């Protein structure tokens, strides 16, 4: 199973329990050539027919330009801080989370090197 970036999903679920060290996955992502040469890198930690949990690492200043999604989205900042814009603009820091409904225009900018978990329903 591959994620939307064409990469192999790390932990496709098949019924049952799975545990993942997010800290270890952040270290792994930051040790790749994609991280060294780019501004962000991501991998699906869990992906099945109903759910996608994406871990993304972003360098300071990295942006996800304004876009919309087909399903609600929750963004949990694991480390660092981001500027999240969806009508209003908020700084979301490590340990904080923001959620939006489907089809809401939004954008993200890393205020510092950051890691975020994006949780979306598959529709």
Predicted regions and their residues:
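A short, N-terminal "cap"/entry segment at the start of jelly-roll beta-barrel domains
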Residues: 1-50, 85
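A cytosolic small-molecule/anion-sensing beta-strand core signal
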Residues: 78-79, 93-94, 112
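A short hydrophobic beta-strand segment most commonly corresponding to one strand
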Residues: 74, 112-123
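Structural motif
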Residues: 81, 105, 114-115
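Glycine- and acidic-residue-biased ligand/ion/polar-headgroup-sensing regions
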Residues: 60, 70-87
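Conserved short histidine dyad/triad with adjacent acidic residue
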Residues: 35-41, 49-68, 102, 123
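Short acidic-glycine-tyrosine-enriched beta hairpin
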Residues: 87-103
